[in-house]
């Protein structure tokens, strides 16, 4: 950990290019941003600008060509992909237990923790169900709990609702947001859905077209009746203004 690190995550002058026999394609060009502890940040940008590549770099599935990614001392990342990737031959309980099993954690402590998570997030009645017996929303909740079982400090969400129908997306985004806030997790969401980004995030980072740079960062402050949720956020008086602002940035001619 760097002595001068002030944030949970810092991305400094990050650049990355794809290298093929035909040549080099610059994807990310000196990208800079940071994330605070407990913050929920969404990244939006044109299709193909390198959003998912950025997450792969943050969790070290790829290595940058230049620049640096600095995560706090002994901090861990968890990665939730577009598909839930639940193993069809394992029960809900066994799917959630996969990470800790690989890490050889105590089975007694593990069982208590999983039972608590299943109860807290309305899956206790489906402990022994196989994935094909779960709804799309239940599968996503199970996938999120599985990711949280590894106790990540930063959760990376790569369009986790994209395979769901619209009504289920609204419900599951509320579920995921509630779980992350309850567990006091820091999250970075990649999405192409402007409304989703506004409804869930404390701050939105807008990337340019490839090669991507950070065009703008927008703090999100919404007035909601009662406690904020993604669903209630969509009816806030400021929501339309934020949508228009993000839309304008994404469609502004370079």
Where do the model's predicted regions map?
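Conserved ABC ATPase "signature" region
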Residues: 108-126, 178
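A short, proline-enriched helix->beta-strand linker immediately N-terminal to the Walker B motif
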Residues: 149-153
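Conserved ABC ATPase signature
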Residues: 130-134, 138
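Helix-to-loop junction immediately C-terminal to a conserved catalytic motif
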Residues: 59
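Catalytic Walker B motif of ABC-type/P-loop ATPase nucleotide-binding domains
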Residues: 155-158
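The feature captures the beta-strand-to-loop junction immediately N-terminal to the Walker
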Residues: 44-46
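Short coil-to-helix segment of the ABC ATPase nucleotide-binding domain corresponding to the Q-loop/switch region
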Residues: 90-97
């Amino acid at each position: 950990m760097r002595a001068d690190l002030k944030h949970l995550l810092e991305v400094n002058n990050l650049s990355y290019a794809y290298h093929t026999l035909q040549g080099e394609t610059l994807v990310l060009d000196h990208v800079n941003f940071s994330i605070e502890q407990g913050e929920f940040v969404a990244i939006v940008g044109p299709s193909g600008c390198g959003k998912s590549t950025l997450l792969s770099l943050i969790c070290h599935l790829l290595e940058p060509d230049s620049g640096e990614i600095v995560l706090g001392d002994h901090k861990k990342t968890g990665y939730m992909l577009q598909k839930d990737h639940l193993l069809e031959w394992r029960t809900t309980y066994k799917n959630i237990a996969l990470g800790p099993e690989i890490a050889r954690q105590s089975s007694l402590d593990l069982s208590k923790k999983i039972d608590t998570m299943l109860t807290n997030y309305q899956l206790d009645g489906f402990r022994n169900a196989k994935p094909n017996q779960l709804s799309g929303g239940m599968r996503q909740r199970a996938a999120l709990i599985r990711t949280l079982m590894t106790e990540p400090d930063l959760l990376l969400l790569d369009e986790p609702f994209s395979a769901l129908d619209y009504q289920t997306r609204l419900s599951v985004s509320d579920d995921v947001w509630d779980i992350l806030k309850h567990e006091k997790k820091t999250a970075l969401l990649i999405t192409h859905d402007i409304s989703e980004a506004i409804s869930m995030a404390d701050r939105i980072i807008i990337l340019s077209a490839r090669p991507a740079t950070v065009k703008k960062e927008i703090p999100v402050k919404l007035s909601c009746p009662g406690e904020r949720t993604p669903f209630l956020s969509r009816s806030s008086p400021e929501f339309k203004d934020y949508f228009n602002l993000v839309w304008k940035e994404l469609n502004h001619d370079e």
